[in-house]
């Protein structure tokens, strides 16, 4: 969210920020996202509430499941079925409502957990669908899905963010942070973030438990 927002702002876009409260365990991110939206003075910031707690196969929505702390082969339990498709569809609907032609998303397919909806081919396919399934698209106004971080590793993403003055102390990546937003330092997301700062050789401002 933060790195992509900073990048879009620096590229001259008028930014509208969308966040989804889907009853995820890591809802602390909503607090940080609001602060970032205010910091970057977005035109409008929306939070859409969707209860996905009934998607019981994901440890991000099923609180009776443990968040895995050891990387595993295959797609981990933190995968939420079709999450990015739902989020992108809401973003697409809002973009068409406000006559916006560019949608930015911060997915990454290098240092990631193996989610199928974070891959470059998924982004291309969604963009094709967006231009087939919307009034804006069929009338000839191309809708672009921008995923500028898709081919970057975590260290490269952090470096890019720092070059655009991103304050990473205002962000949280953890799948199971405390109510105060302190990261667990055990989950896959914490590991990837921590290793990114280590590889870059800069101090990690994350508050860990």
Regions found by a protein language model. Name each.
Residues 1-164:
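ATP-dependent adenylation/nucleotidyltransferase module used to activate substrates
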Residues 164-185:
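Immediate flanking context of iron-sulfur cluster ligation sites
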Residues 180-183, 188-209:
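Iron-sulfur (Fe-S) cluster-binding segments and ferredoxin-like electron-carrier domains
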Residues 25, 34-36, 178, 198-201:
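Alpha-helix termini
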